[in-house]
């Protein structure tokens, strides 16, 4: 029977007999004495087999190799001074093995080195193909244990301190195609009908509030059939929450306390509360993005008023067309950034054009506040405009001013992209710094040019600001996103809980009363039976753990992730199925492989 985990042993156990289980991380033979680093998920401890002191274990120790699975019984001993290893938690001790039992060996060559004692760069596809080996590696094991700690602290805070209850909601539900594509599941017992896997438990958690559950949470599995990026998966996990009878400030305060609790318990980091707040309009104006990274400055400056009557038609034309002109002021940019990088062919030019811009205009502020720029700008810049630009941007000699001009969306995208790129390149971002904030007051709707209609920016169950009910199409939503160093980790809103308001929102996004009732009649009916005011939020667990672990991809904090092609290299999913299975489901495939 196991008495301890490998990484939990310390000098307190010296002279005690222990039994351990684990994998051989490394084996060394020093002058006839064999040293084995035994590894389990808790860490590593050194096993010693000495033919003089522990002769019974020695013949077995001679035969073991890396990744063999062992049972080891022995006595904890103090390491000699010259053998102390401060790099591991058990570096003061070693185990003299009285017994070693090989529980299983390795019969094939390892596809990569698992041991943390050797560094080897392994292609991600190989890691995913042999994920069970990859998860033995220290970094990956620690990531999964960190994920467990985060979930454990979420549960502790919500249940023990805030009176939440955990409720599971259905995985097989009906399709309500508003947003990303659903994963569909054919029903065998109802031929021709389909379930959908949930993109979120949104409607069910609202119905739980109607049911009087008051405060609900769930570690929810969600599914979206969409094109993947580094921070997306077709199946993902979120902390899903819903609360009745709380005002918007109360919901924000509760969630701030939750996040502060997680950071303190998991990383021993103190988060200052309350968190800063930006409205959507402020975030877009100052940063060009609704999830700003506020660890550094380089804020955008709107200079449309200065150039509305400019003779430089690129600027004045953009403003006359309903667009804008903004500046990204860069201190010491004259020295750090060459013209080659800004002009066609340069890396910054490419960043801007990839975001939709046609190019980058610039002004270099020289000594005595002389402006160095292209002739078309310089020739059309009045002294009053020059002075106004200096005052508004705070520019000083050495500043480089990068301009975006055009439709507001493109200007924001291009300059916010340049801001982030330059923040990294100029060393302005402290990787150890943590900036959390709320972004609030999002627009209720955005225009879908392809479908020529309004659609909900978040989802159509978000409550509009009561001040904006007279002009719902232009309404602000009672919505809020939590941002962690420029990445959204959670988002939520107060919900609509009155049938007439919900019907107005459905009508605004182009749903007829018949369509709305067909898709959401069960929710509309529930609103007739005493629905409490309520609101909620969902946190992307994968993304939050990724950030806490300092990883670049959520695939490194998920046990068995999919690739960016939504496939599992370990199990070869998705796969074809037998024609008999399809027939039972009344389904036929129309796919024909390319010739």
Curated annotation (Swiss-Prot):
It holds the Pfam family GAD. ATP binds at residues 224-226, 233, 488, 540-543. PROSITE patterns: AA_TRNA_LIGASE_II. One of its GO terms (cellular component) is cytoplasm. Keywords: Aminoacyl-tRNA synthetase, ATP-binding, Cytoplasm, Ligase, Nucleotide-binding, Protein biosynthesis. One of its GO terms (biological process) is aspartyl-tRNA aminoacylation. L-aspartate binds at residues 178, 224, 458, 495. The record marks 30 as: Important for tRNA non-discrimination. Residues 202-205 are annotated as: Aspartate. Disulfide bonds: none annotated. It is an enzyme of class 6 (ligase). PANTHER family: ASPARTATE--TRNA LIGASE, MITOCHONDRIAL (PTHR22594:SF5), ASPARTYL/LYSYL-TRNA SYNTHETASE (PTHR22594). Homodimer. Belongs to the class-II aminoacyl-tRNA synthetase family. Type 1 subfamily. Aspartyl-tRNA synthetase with relaxed tRNA specificity since it is able to aspartylate not only its cognate tRNA(Asp) but also tRNA(Asn). Reaction proceeds in two steps: L-aspartate is first activated by ATP to form Asp-AMP and then transferred to the acceptor end of tRNA(Asp/Asn). This is Aspartate--tRNA(Asp/Asn) ligase. It comes from Microcystis aeruginosa (strain NIES-843 / IAM M-2473). The gene is aspS.
């Amino acid at each position: 029977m196991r008495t301890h985990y490998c990484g939990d042993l310390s000098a307190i156990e010296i002279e005690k007999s222990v039994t351990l289980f684990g994998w051989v991380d490394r084996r060394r033979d020093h002058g006839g004495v064999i040293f084995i680093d035994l590894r389990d998920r808790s860490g590593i401890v050194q096993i010693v087999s000495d033919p003089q002191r522990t002769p019974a274990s020695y013949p077995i120790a001679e035969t073991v190799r890396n990744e063999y699975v062992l049972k080891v019984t022995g006595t904890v001993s103090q390491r000699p001074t010259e053998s102390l290893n401060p790099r591991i938690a058990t570096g003061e001790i070693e185990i003299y093995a009285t017994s070693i039992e090989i529980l299983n060996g390795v019969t094939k060559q390892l596809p990569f080195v698992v041991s943390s004692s050797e560094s080897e760069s392994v292609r991600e596809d190989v890691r995913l193909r042999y994920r069970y080996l990859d998860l033995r590696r220290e970094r990956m094991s620690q990531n999964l244990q960190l994920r467990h700690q985060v979930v454990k602290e979420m549960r502790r805070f919500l249940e023990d301190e805030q009176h939440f209850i955990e409720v599971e909601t259905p995985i097989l539900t009906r399709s309500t195609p508003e947003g990303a594509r659903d994963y569909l599941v054919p029903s065998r017992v109802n031929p021709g009908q389909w379930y959908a896997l949930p993109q979120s438990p949104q409607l069910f958690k609202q119905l739980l509030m109607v049911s009087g559950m008051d405060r609900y949470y769930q570690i929810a599995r969600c599914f979206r059939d969409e094109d993947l990026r580094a921070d997306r998966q077709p199946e993902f996990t979120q902390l899903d929450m819903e609360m009745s009878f709380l005002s918007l400030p109360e919901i924000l305060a509760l969630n701030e306390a939750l996040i502060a609790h997680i950071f303190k318990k998991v990383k021993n980091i103190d988060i200052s509360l309350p968190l800063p707040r930006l409205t959507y309009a402020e975030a877009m104006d100052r940063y060009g993005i609704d999830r700003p990274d506020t660890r550094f400055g380089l804020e955008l400056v709107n200079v449309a008023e200065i150039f509305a009557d400019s003779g430089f038609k690129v600027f004045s034309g953009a403003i006359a067309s309903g667009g804008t002109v903004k500046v990204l002021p860069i201190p010491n940019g004259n020295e750090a950034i060459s013209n080659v990088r800004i002009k066609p062919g340069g890396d910054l030019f490419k960043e801007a054009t990839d975001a939709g811009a046609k190019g980058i205009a610039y002004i270099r502020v020289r000594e005595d506040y002389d402006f160095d720029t292209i002739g078309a700008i310089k020739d059309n810049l009045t002294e009053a405009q020059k002075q106004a630009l200096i005052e508004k941007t705070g520019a000083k000699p050495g500043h480089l001013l990068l301009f975006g001009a055009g439709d507001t969306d493109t200007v924001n995208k291009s300059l916010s992209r340049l801001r982030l790129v330059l923040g990294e390149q100029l060393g302005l971002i402290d990787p150890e710094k943590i900036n959390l904030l709320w972004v609030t007051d999002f627009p209720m709707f955005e225009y879908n040019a392809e479908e020529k209609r309004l659609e909900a920016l978040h989802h159509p169950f978000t409550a509009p600001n009561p001040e904006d009910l007279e002009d719902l199409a232009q309404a602000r939503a009672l919505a809020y996103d939590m941002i962690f160093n420029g990445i959204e980790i959670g988002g939520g809103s107060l919900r609509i809980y009155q049938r007439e308001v919900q019907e107005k929102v459905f009508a605004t996004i182009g749903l007829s009363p018949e369509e709305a009732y067909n898709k959401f009649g069960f929710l509309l009916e529930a609103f007739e039976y005493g629905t409490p005011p309520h609101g909620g939020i969902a946190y992307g667990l994968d993304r939050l753990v990724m950030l806490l672990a300092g990883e670049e991809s959520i695939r490194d904090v998920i046990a068995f992730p999919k690739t960016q092609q939504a496939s599992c290299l370990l199990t070869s999913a998705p796969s074809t199925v037998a024609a008999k299975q399809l027939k039972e489901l009344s389904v036929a495939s129309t796919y024909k492989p390319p010739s």
